[in-house]
Amino acid sequence: MIINIHINFFMTTISSVFKKLDKQCALIPFITAGDPDLVSTSKALKILDQHGADIIELGLPYSDPLADGPIIQAASSRALKQSINLNNILDMVNITSSNIVAPIVLFTYYNPVLNLGINNFISAISRAGIKGLLIPDLPIEESDYIISVCKLFNIELIFLLSPTSSIERINKIVEQAPGCIYLVSTTGVTGQKPELTGKLKRLTETIKKMTQKPIILGFGISTAEQIKEIKGWNINGIVIGSAFVKRLSSDFPEEGLRKIKDFCTTAKSIIIS
């Protein structure tokens, strides 16, 4: 893999975003790389950065996305049919990241990391300008080495925490997580869910008492009502995925870009209001 390096003096780190926002909630949109095409993905990253995104999550298309709902699965399938892969995604990110401030988190399953080799994978995404990494199927019991490699390359590894986790499991993840913790809002896959629960709110309160590490919430958040509710939970970030992916997958790329711009602007205005 050969990447021409474009040094980015503007993109911030994930931890610095949370420090800057202090108690304000970060807006974290998710989009799938290569859907509808890589040119549109590059434009989408810039649009999201310019219209309220504090951090941007970029999904690496994968053939067996167990944690993804139907909207994101379909987006991955469309991207893979165009021969979108890690190499051309990182080439695009390398060029685009020099024009944006919001740090990019790469969402990928563990298998692509293992196929390339942990050191090679982390080195490659770091050179391209990626600032964070989220691996939903990474077993915490196998995470020590990848944590050390991420630290070496200044990549912030984000751990997932399920709402069904035992207290013992929560303690282990909270203690081992090198940075922010991604709390899954519902059991099952990603997607647009109608409501959130009081149990989830109580869980966020419990975790906040256990750690000073930033807590972000995602999976199933898609409406203005949900954003309004969650921003009052004293969490550090809201991840919105399927709602952005669905809008971006419009019949015409420019229409999709307009839709995500409008939705990003709306979501940010709700958070800061």
Swiss-Prot record:
GO cellular-component term (any): chloroplast
Pathway recorded for this protein: Amino-acid biosynthesis; L-tryptophan biosynthesis; L-tryptophan from chorismate: step 5/5
Swiss-Prot/TrEMBL keywords: Amino-acid biosynthesis, Aromatic amino acid biosynthesis, Chloroplast, Lyase, Plastid, Tryptophan biosynthesis
Coiled coil ranges: none
MF terms in GO: tryptophan synthase activity
Places the protein is found: Plastid, Chloroplast
Active site: 57 (proton acceptor), 68 (proton acceptor)
Pfam families: Trp_syntA
CDD domains registered for this protein in UniProt: Tryptophan_synthase_alpha
EC number: 4.2.1.20
Catalyzed reactions: (1S,2R)-1-C-(indol-3-yl)glycerol 3-phosphate + L-serine = D-glyceraldehyde 3-phosphate + L-tryptophan + H2O
Subunit structure: Tetramer of two alpha and two beta chains.
Protein family according to the UniProt entry: Belongs to the TrpA family.
Function recorded in the entry: The alpha subunit is responsible for the aldol cleavage of indoleglycerol phosphate to indole and glyceraldehyde 3-phosphate.
Name this protein carries in UniProt: Tryptophan synthase alpha chain
